[in-house]
Amino acid sequence: ANVGSVYYSSDQFLNLSAINPAFNLLASMEFGEKYEDEFDFFPEEQRASLMEGMYATADTATVSVLNTKRPNILFIFMESFGSTMIERQGGVKGVAPSLDRLASEGVFFSNLYANSFRTDRGTVCTYSAYPGLPTLSIMKVPNIARKLPNIAQSLGKAGYQTDFLYGGDINFTNMRGYLMAGGFQKLTSQDDFSMHDRNYSKWGVPDNITFKRLLAMLKEREGQKEPWFTAFLTLSSHEPFEVPFKKFEDKHRNAFAFTDDCIGKFIKEFRKSPQWDNTLIVLLPD
């Protein structure tokens, strides 16, 4: 049940009041089946032993890579952009020169994996630190999703302005409901773009246009004292790979090259902003 489509307020009581209770009850019945036996591979003691090593931390001083304690944070979630398209990771040559260049300029994590296999699961994994489940999308279960911690909620409590930008249908897989419950104060989606911008691809607004919107949004904040956290989910490297760009004959590679080109142009322009020196930019494939 995509109940997030009726969410309209930062007050979750009001959002929950807008849900049809009878419909919600019937929809929740599909989650009654239990799947524990299908994925219960190890005894509890062995599971605890395996997990213990993952949480080990070195007893050393933390090395800071920032020049401020309250930086602006721009999180760019790159649709489907795995290492197969990154040359320095052994991927296809020439597809992502911008990302290859940025990797050498910043801090590059070469052995980092998301615990998910779809964007809805990867989003929850990234913002809420909740691992993607094999048979169930937590984003589609509002009663669970709204109770999860969220980086937007934490930063909001710390005085940050929080917002989310996506050029597609933000109601898909109940994304709107999850994001609003998670503390994102403003959402921008395909509904906030003209029909002309939306008509190029059936999946939504192409990345060159959404990156321009992102740049305009950030420019409006120049001079404001309140720090901000902006999350941006790209779109064009998703099938059907319809992009206003021609570098490769292969549509798949060409779409990824287009997103990379958009990222490179955005970074080039944002470097000119007075906010550049006080902004942490994180790029992560979904």
What are these language model-derived features?
Residues N2-P285:
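Soluble catalytic regions of membrane-associated enzymes that act on cell-envelope
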